[in-house]
Amino acid sequence: MTPSLKRLSGAMRARPAPALSGTIKAPGDKSISHRAFILGGLAKGVTEVTGLLESDDVINSGRAAAALGAKVEHLGPGHWRIDGCGGQWTTPSAPLDFGNAGTGVRLMMGAVAGTGTSADFIGDESLSSRPMRRVTDPLGEMGARFTTTGGRLPAHLDGGPLAGIHYTPPIASAQVKSAVLLAALGATGTTVVHEPQITRDHTETMLRAFGVTLTVERDGAAATVTLTGPQTLIACPVDVPGDPSSSAFAIVAALISPGSDITLEGVMDNPARTGLIETLKEMGADITLTPGPDMAGEKTMHIHVKHSQLHGITVPATRAPSMIDEYPVLCVAAAYADGITHMPGLEELRAKESDRLAGSAAMLRANGVPVEEGEDSLAVTGMGIGGVPGGGRTVTHHDHRLAMSGLVIGLGAKAASSVDDIAMIATSYPDFFDHIATLGGRLEPLT
């Protein structure tokens, strides 16, 4: 079922770029793509998906759905057909291997628990170091029986009946909320998830598209989601919109490269995902948004970006859930701003594919940018356009977003910058190299 993916590995260098220009179509959204495989695999009927992000992480979710009994077919670039199981997974013959996909494994834990199926969940070294109790604990309250390795992978799930719960996640996490809601589809009774701080709502939107009845009540920055089970998903077409998190790299590259003028087409426009654009505009970015067509129940936009003189700001901690994946590349923008950019409320970055808070600070220091690292904060002293020395090498710690950020910082620096490995970029954005090259960026493999 797997298409051929672009495979590049080893160190890479980014040279200072001339003005970036041109138009690219944003890559398919990773969050929507994961959910398309999981919901399509669980649904009754055939789900046809277009625009799917064919990255390593997403493909691992597709493989898991196939191992659980769904029929998954690749019809062409980004085009897939999923014949679902009608709410009845089959016990897989081998562990479900999610590689580096935290979203995939956490959501699938909920989806499998809700069907009463038993399964083993494994991942690579990076994923196996990430916390899973944030998902297994609430699923356990519903009746799922997990055995984990110190709260991490490998994990075993013994299938059994579930009951609805009222749950307030201790952290703002769309993955936790989604795992509970997916389990609630097969649970008896009503499940209520109360979010003190609203997170991305793709699961709620897509569940409705698949015929699920649920309610969402918002109260300021909080939200309460209510779902009564059991319910069966009914297959529907999914046209995946562009990924705001992946689009961030080209946006920042254009902002820091004098004379640049680029457009990204078809990017998802969801308030729970647009925190970076809001932040960059507050920093002085020349960004124009034009409405695009609705896709997968989401609004989209075309983003026009021109090189800009940026200035430091304080990013509200309450904005972190809407841009948690974009902080490494925001650090790049902050490096080229005038003044200090303060970023509080970043404790969740410590538990990503790597310690992204420490990794982002190390990337900046390696390239001559002053930064203060707190327990849950960063303060970046910007050096202005053309003022970043560059010349450093970013240690990626197998983290795709650190790798891409470590390359973008070199596009506007005085000297070329490099990263120690690029192999993991395929987990989220296999077209990154082609897109940057199309816009005029200079990326060179190092031997």
Swiss-Prot record:
One Gene Ontology cellular component: cytoplasm
Q: Which region ranges are annotated with the description Disordered?
A: 1-22
Q: In which pathway does it act?
A: Metabolic intermediate biosynthesis; chorismate biosynthesis; chorismate from D-erythrose 4-phosphate and phosphoenolpyruvate: step 6/7
Q: Which reaction does it catalyse?
A: 3-phosphoshikimate + phosphoenolpyruvate = 5-O-(1-carboxyvinyl)-3-phosphoshikimate + phosphate
Against InterPro entries, the record matches this protein to:
Enolpyruvate_Tfrase_dom, Enolpyruvate_Tfrase_sf, EPSP_synthase, EPSP_synthase_CS, RNA3'P_cycl/enolpyr_Trfase_a/b
Give the GO terms filed under biological process for this record: amino acid biosynthetic process; aromatic amino acid family biosynthetic process; chorismate biosynthetic process
An annotated Gene Ontology molecular function: 3-phosphoshikimate 1-carboxyvinyltransferase activity
Q: Where found, per UniProt?
A: Cytoplasm
Residue positions binding phosphoenolpyruvate: K30, G102, R130, Q175, R356, R401
Task: Give the residues annotated as active site.
Answer: D325 (proton acceptor)
EC number, as in UniProt: 2.5.1.19
- Family matches, as Pfam families: EPSP_synthase
Which terms are listed as keywords in the entry?
Answer: Amino-acid biosynthesis, Aromatic amino acid biosynthesis, Cytoplasm, Transferase
Primary localisation category = cytoplasm
Superkingdom of origin: Bacteria
Q: Which SUPFAM superfamilies match?
A: EPT/RTPC-like
Name the PANTHER family for this protein: AROM/DEHYDROQUINATE SYNTHASE, PENTAFUNCTIONAL AROM POLYPEPTIDE
Annotated NCBIfam families: aroA (TIGR01356)
User: Belongs to which family?
Assistant: Belongs to the EPSP synthase family.
Report the function annotation for this chain. Answer: Catalyzes the transfer of the enolpyruvyl moiety of phosphoenolpyruvate (PEP) to the 5-hydroxyl of shikimate-3-phosphate (S3P) to produce enolpyruvyl shikimate-3-phosphate and inorganic phosphate.
How is the subunit organization of this protein annotated in UniProt? Monomer.
Q: What is the protein name for this chain?
A: 3-phosphoshikimate 1-carboxyvinyltransferase
The top of its lineage is: Bacteria, Pseudomonadati, Pseudomonadota, Alphaproteobacteria, Maricaulales
